[in-house]
């Protein structure tokens, strides 16, 4: 079943057109990746879906509802959460305080269960619960950013460059956790410059070039595509 459908969206930063007719889908429980070079429009696509940088034209449908003009905070409530590039943790707040912000639109006993779930996924966050986020390593901050997004109980998790600037051993752990999150029923739309890693994690992918979808296929086909190999896989 299609959970997210993006249809011919164009997104602008002032006079600059960053997205030039992007269309894509994500099914319930699926992992889909966007790959491409810097400036291809990957992060802007996530920002448009999440409502942070609204699309100028086109439509975005989530769970059967048009969310193209829905404010970002309402999109979170409807079930889409973004873990942004660069993590954007609040450095002077503790791990627990950062996580609590992810649930600030929610009420009820389920929040305590979600803290437990995040701590089960990322034991380091439990160990550093009272530590200031600004004193943590890049990998730990990435765990915190993903954990904070999960506190919103999303149906769709948007991950923007989760391996950026992180030691390889922590990249492995984060991708293991992404797999666990997906197996729990959360669909994931993943942006990565590490195309090998992204295609290994996803069932399908879209290659973006200068704000357009240049290629869309299953991950195995993209892995074997000579153009993708030359441009993004280092082969």
Regions found by a protein language model. Name each.
Residues 2-235:
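Glycine-rich phosphate-binding loops of nucleotide-dependent enzymes
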């Amino acid at each position: 079943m299609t959970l997210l459908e993006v249809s011919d969206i164009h997104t602008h930063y002032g006079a600059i057109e960053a997205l030039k007719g992007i269309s894509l889908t994500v099914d319930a429980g699926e992992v889909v990746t966007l790959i491409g070079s810097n400036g291809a429009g990957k992060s802007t696509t996530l920002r448009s879906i999440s409502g942070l940088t609204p699309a100028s034209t086109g439509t975005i449908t989530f769970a059967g509802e048009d969310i193209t003009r829905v404010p970002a905070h309402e999109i979170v409530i409807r079930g889409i959460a973004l873990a942004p590039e660069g993590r954007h943790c609040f450095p002077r707040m503790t791990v627990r305080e950062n996580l609590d912000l992810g649930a600030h639109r929610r009420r009820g006993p389920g929040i305590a269960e979600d803290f437990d779930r995040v701590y089960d996924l990322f034991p380091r966050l439990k160990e550093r619960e009272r530590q200031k986020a600004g004193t943590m390593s890049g990998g730990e901050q990435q765990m915190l950013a993903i954990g904070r997004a999960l506190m919103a109980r999303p149906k769709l998790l948007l991950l923007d460059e989760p391996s950026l600037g992180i030691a390889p051993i922590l990249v492995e752990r984060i991708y293991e956790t992404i797999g666990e999150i997906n197996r729990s029923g959360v669909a994931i739309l993943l942006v990565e410059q590490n195309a090998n890693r992204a295609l290994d994690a996803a069932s399908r992918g879209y290659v973006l070039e200068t704000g357009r979808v240049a290629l869309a296929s299953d991950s195995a086909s993209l892995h074997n595509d000579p153009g993708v190999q030359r441009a993004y896989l280092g082969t």
